[in-house]
């Protein structure tokens, strides 16, 4: 699945709530999201207007690995 090109950090954080993540803190221009599904896991997302595709792909890969999904499966759950 092709990744969205104009996704903001806040929109991405909202999408990650669909798979059990929640914002635990925000410091400056970064948000930290945490889930306890399958063990505690943290990801840090820049709160920028538009996330770079490589940044988005890296975070998706990290989350997908933790959840035991492929990156494409996770992208479909979040963006479809």
Model features per residue range: what roles?
Residues 23-57:
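A short, structured beta-strand/loop element
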Residues 2, 46, 64:
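Short, flexible active-site loop motifs that bind/organize anionic cofactors or intermediates
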Residues 3, 41, 74:
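Glycine-rich, flexible loop/turn motifs
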Residues 1-27:
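N-terminal first-folded block
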Residues 50-80:
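C-terminal structural segments of small proteins and small subunits
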């Amino acid at each position: 699945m092709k990744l969205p090109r104009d996704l903001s950090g806040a929109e991405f954080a909202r999408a990650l709530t669909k798979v059990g993540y929640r914002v635990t803190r925000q410091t400056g221009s970064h948000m930290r999201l945490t889930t306890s599904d399958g063990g505690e896991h943290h990801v840090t997302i820049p709160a920028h207007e538009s996330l770079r595709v490589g940044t988005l792909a890296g975070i998706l890969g990290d989350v997908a690995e933790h959840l035991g999904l492929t990156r494409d499966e996770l992208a479909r759950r979040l963006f479809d």
